[in-house]
């Protein structure tokens, strides 16, 4: 092979390697640590109470820590009754960008109101997440049927700016 041909093969191979590395970076696996940061979200849906179905909505902000700890606060409405709630929980994110979260919801006095389990999927390279409530349990142990979905967007990747939470 001539020097020119060898140089062409070398440059071509190098360019293919760089392109493959760039492609690999674009498809990084998701993880609990990569999800860490500050998030804003909305949840909407329906709760099935013993007295009948009622609408549910909330908007809030939460922190996800690289250690799988979640905390935040929200303003929620159940059937038009608005309250401010404190959120504490845990989460995990799988390499395929699915995940799970368990959230304990407290009133401002520290009384447990409910415990929620959610199934999650992180999208848009970890800049957003979608979720659905898979379980809602009251403090007395009673399960409450619900159809509630969530939409969250990352505010920023910084973790530790939690002065707004309790």
Q: Model features per residue range: what roles?
A:
Residues 1-4:
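N-terminal secretory signal peptides that target proteins for export/translocation
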């Amino acid at each position: 092979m001539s020097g020119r041909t060898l140089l062409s093969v070398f440059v071509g191979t190098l360019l293919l390697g760089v392109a493959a590395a760039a492609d690999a970076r674009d498809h990084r696996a998701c993880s609990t640590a990569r999800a860490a940061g500050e998030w804003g979200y909305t949840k909407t849906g329906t709760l099935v109470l013993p007295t009948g179905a009622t609408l549910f909505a909330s908007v809030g902000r939460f922190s996800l820590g690289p250690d799988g700890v979640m905390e935040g606060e929200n303003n929620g409405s159940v059937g038009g009754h608005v309250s401010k709630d404190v959120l504490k929980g845990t989460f995990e994110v799988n390499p395929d960008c699915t995940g799970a979260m368990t959230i304990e919801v407290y009133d401002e006095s520290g009384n447990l109101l409910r415990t929620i389990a959610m199934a999650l999927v992180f999208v848009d390279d970890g800049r957003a997440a979608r979720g659905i409530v898979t379980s809602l349990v009251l403090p007395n142990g009673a399960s409450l049927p619900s159809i509630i979905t969530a939409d969250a967007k990352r505010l920023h990747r910084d973790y530790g700016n939690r002065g707004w939470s309790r």
